[in-house]
């Protein structure tokens, strides 16, 4: 079977993925991509997919068949190649006691685009490979500064922007993971209280694969003029995925999700956003629009979207919230 990017007419390729003969990506339609599944078995049920998907995300078993099984097969090849390279490098360096480090997959994309669903489904599929690898999933939410710190520094309206994260703690965590250390602590976050949970951690104990999900995980930093090594989060990734969609679609999904949450999670008196559950629908929608335009859209333009070309794989979603196009970086 031979499927190439040129099989798609240029008019069918989203403008943000077009790069002519100099494009670093192979681009496939979802239907063509699905054929790369080969004999990869479907190990999830419809009920499990429903449990894994986020609110307002219609991803179903058909989407898993079309997109995620081929992606699982691709990642299996990358993990196997990484293991071979690790053994060869260990022999080259005569390091007989070298500890195998986890294969780290970064998942990035805008708020409301569906990256959490992608990360959860991937983690489940990878854990069900015949080799039964140990797979952990960690999100960057826990590495946000606590609300008390953000309020003190006047950063609550910048929550989700790079400066709202404890980058030092984030880098120390990934460094420890890549060093193969046991029981590395990842701080946890409550979407109910909209805050980091004090003294509560997720223990990550030398997994074979770590799925690391967050909006800004592919972001780079300015390089110092003196050539000093400045680590970036993506330096610790073995493979990276960017979940993409047209801006107008993400906007619509964000507002619709906010309105759905108003009817569900926001009803809880403990919710940080409980006050929005009691106002009129028009007032709530106006607040959602304001949050989108004043915070999330700015973050998308300034910090998230510019990282898209750094991804190894881009999943481009369409109006139905399902993947329409897949772009895979050329080797």
UniProtKB/Swiss-Prot annotation:
Catalytic activity annotation: (R)-pantothenate + ATP = (R)-4'-phosphopantothenate + ADP + H(+)
GO terms for cellular component: cytoplasm
Presence of the UniProt keyword Transferase in the record: yes
Compartments it resides in: Cytoplasm
Gene Ontology biological-process annotations: coenzyme A biosynthetic process
Superkingdom, natural source: Bacteria
Pfam families to which the protein is assigned, alphabetical: PRK
Entry-linked Gene3D superfamilies: P-loop containing nucleotide triphosphate hydrolases (3.40.50.300)
GO molecular function: ATP binding; pantothenate kinase activity
Family: Belongs to the prokaryotic pantothenate kinase family.
NCBIfam families on file: panK_bact (TIGR00554)
Protein name stated in the entry: Pantothenate kinase
């Amino acid at each position: 079977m031979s499927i190439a990017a040129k099989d798609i007419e240029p008019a069918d390729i989203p403008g943000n993925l077009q790069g002519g003969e100099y494009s670093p990506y192979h681009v496939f339609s979802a239907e063509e991509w699905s054929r790369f599944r080969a004999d990869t078995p479907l190990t999830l049920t419809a009920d499990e997919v429903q449990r894994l998907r986020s609110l307002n995300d219609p991803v179903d078993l058909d989407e898993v068949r079309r997109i995620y099984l081929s992606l699982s097969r691709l990642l299996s090849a990358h993990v196997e190649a990484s293991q071979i390279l690790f053994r060869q490098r260990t022999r080259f360096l005569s390091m007989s006691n070298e500890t195998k480090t986890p294969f780290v997959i970064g998942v990035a994309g805008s708020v409301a685009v569906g990256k959490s669903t992608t990360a959860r489904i991937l983690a489940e599929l990878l854990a069900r490979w015949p080799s039964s690898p140990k797979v952990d999933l960690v999100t960057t939410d826990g590495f946000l500064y606590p609300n008390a710190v953000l309020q003190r520094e006047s950063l609550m309206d910048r929550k989700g922007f790079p400066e709202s994260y404890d980058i030092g703690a984030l880098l120390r965590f990934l460094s420890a993971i890549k060093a193969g250390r046991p029981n590395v602590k990842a701080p946890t976050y409550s979407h109910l209280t909209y805050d980091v949970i004090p003294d509560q951690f997720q223990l990550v104990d030398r997994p074979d694969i770590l799925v690391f999900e967050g909006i800004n995980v592919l972001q780079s930093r300015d390089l110092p003029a003196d050539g000093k090594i400045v680590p970036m989060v993506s330096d610790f990734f073995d493979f990276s995925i960017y979940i993409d969609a047209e801006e107008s679609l993400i906007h619509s999904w964000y507002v619709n999700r906010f309105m759905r949450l108003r009817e569900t999670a926001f009803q809880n008196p403990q919710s940080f956003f409980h006050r929005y559950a009691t106002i009129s629908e028009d007032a709530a929608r106006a607040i959602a629009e304001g949050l989108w335009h004043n915070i999330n859209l700015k973050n998308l333009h300034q910090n998230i979207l510019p990282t898209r070309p750094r991804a190894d794989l881009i999943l481009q979603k369409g109006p139905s919230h399902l993947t329409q196009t897949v772009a895979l970086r050329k080797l």
